[in-house]
C-alpha cells in the first residue's frame, strides 16, 4: 500500500543497486542492500522480510521508504536519525561496469524522525523498464519459473475445476485477456508502420520483444534544468499510474505465494486501459514526437510481458494475441 513522502531531508546521496538476477522487484533489491548495510554497521542481522519497506505515493517519481532505523532505535538505544545516517553510510557501493552489470540509481535521503527514502532516478527507471523487454534476456519475463509444459485454457473453455475458482470472475479474466490482446495489436501495428521492430512477434503465442529502437528512448534528449540529469518521457499521470501498478505487482510477487493474482492482473489491465485512453501514440504524437510514441510503445511492451505472465504462468489461461 502506498504512503506519502516528502523531500524534507537532512542528507542526500547517490547510490546504485544491481538489477541482475531473476526478479524485477525493486523492494527485494533494496531490502537486500539494507540488510547488508545492517551487517556492515555491526548490527545483528535481521530476516529480510522483516525489514520495513514500502513504495510511496509521489507525483514526481518513484520512491520507497524504510522505517528500519525507527525499528532498531529502541534495541540499540540510539536516535533513529543517528541509525539512519549510519545505515546510509554503510550501504554497499557498486562500481558500474556497463558491459557486465545492470545497475539502477537511487537518490538516498534521511528524513525526520528517521526515515530512509530511496528515490529512483529517471535514468534508473529507464533501466528498469528496458530490462523487461531486453532482446538478450528473459530473466524478468516470468514471475515464477514454469514447471513443465502447461495446457493453457482459453477463456470460453474453462474446466469445472477452473470454473469453481473463477465462477464470479470470468468477466475480470476476459478484461485482462482483452488488455493483453490490445497490447499485441498496438505493437503489431507499430511494427507494420515502422515505429518499432518486433523480434519474432507471433500473435498466437504472443511472445515478442522490441529490438528497434534499442534501447527504447525512455529519456528526453535534453537534460533537466538544475539537475543536469536525463529526464523520463513518461510523465503523464496515466503513465505514472501504470508504471506504479507494475512495480507494486512485481514487489508483491517477490514475497510469498499469492492468492490474489486475478486482482493484481485486473489492477494492471485497468491502469493500462486508462493509459490507452489518455496517452496518444498515433497522429500528431507519432509525427511530431516519435520518440515519445516509441517510449509509450515500450510501456505497452512491458505491460504485454506482465499480463502474459500473469495469465499463462499464474492463472493458467490463454494470453491471446487477438480477440
Language-model regions, residue ranges each:
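Non-catalytic interaction-recognition regions
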Residues: 2-323
Amino acid at each position: 500500500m502506498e504512503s506519502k513522502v516528502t523531500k524534507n531531508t537532512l542528507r542526500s546521496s547517490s547510490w546504485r543497486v544491481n538489477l541482475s538476477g531473476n526478479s524485477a522487484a525493486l523492494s527485494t533489491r533494496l531490502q537486500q542492500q539494507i540488510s547488508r548495510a545492517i551487517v556492515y554497521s555491526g548490527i545483528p542481522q535481521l530476516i529480510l522480510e522483516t525489514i520495513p519497506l514500502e513504495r510511496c505515493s509521489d507525483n514526481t517519481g518513484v520512491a520507497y521508504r524504510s522505517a528500519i532505523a525507527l525499528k532498531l532505535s529502541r534495541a540499540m538505544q540510539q536516535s533513529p536519525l543517528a541509525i539512519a545516517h549510519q545505515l546510509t553510510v554503510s550501504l554497499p557501493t557498486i562500481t558500474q561496469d556497463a558491459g557486465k552489470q545492470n545497475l539502477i540509481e537511487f537518490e538516498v535521503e534521511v528524513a525526520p524522525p528517521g526515515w530512509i527514502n530511496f528515490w529512483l532516478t529517471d535514468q534508473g527507471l529507464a533501466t528498469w523498464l528496458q530490462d523487461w523487454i531486453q532482446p538478450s534476456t528473459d530473466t524478468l519475463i516470468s514471475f515464477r519459473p514454469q514447471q513443465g509444459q502447461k495446457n493453457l485454457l482459453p477463456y470460453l473453455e474453462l474446466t469445472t475445476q477452473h470454473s469453481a475458482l473463477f465462477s464470479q470472475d470470468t468477466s475480470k479474466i476476459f478484461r485482462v485477456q482483452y488488455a493483453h490482446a490490445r497490447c499485441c495489436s498496438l505493437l503489431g501495428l507499430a511494427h507494420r508502420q515502422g515505429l518499432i521492430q518486433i523480434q519474432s512477434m507471433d500473435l498466437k503465442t504472443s511472445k515478442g520483444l522490441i529490438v528497434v529502437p534499442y534501447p527504447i528512448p525512455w529519456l528526453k534528449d535534453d537534460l533537466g534544468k538544475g539537475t543536469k540529469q536525463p529526464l523520463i518521457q513518461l510523465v503523464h499521470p496515466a503513465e505514472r499510474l501504470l508504471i506504479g501498478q507494475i512495480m507494486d505487482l512485481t514487489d508483491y510477487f517477490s514475497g510469498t505465494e499469492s492468492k490474489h493474482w486475478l486482482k493484481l492482473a485486473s489492477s494492471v489491465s485497468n491502469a493500462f486501459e486508462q493509459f490507452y485512453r489518455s496517452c496518444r501514440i498515433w497522429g500528431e504524437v507519432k509525427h511530431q514526437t516519435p520518440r515519445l510514441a516509441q517510449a509509450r510503445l515500450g510501456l505497452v511492451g512491458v505491460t504485454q510481458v506482465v499480463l502474459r505472465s500473469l495469465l499463462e504462468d499464474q492463472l493458467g489461461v490463454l494470453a491471446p494475441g487477438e480477440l
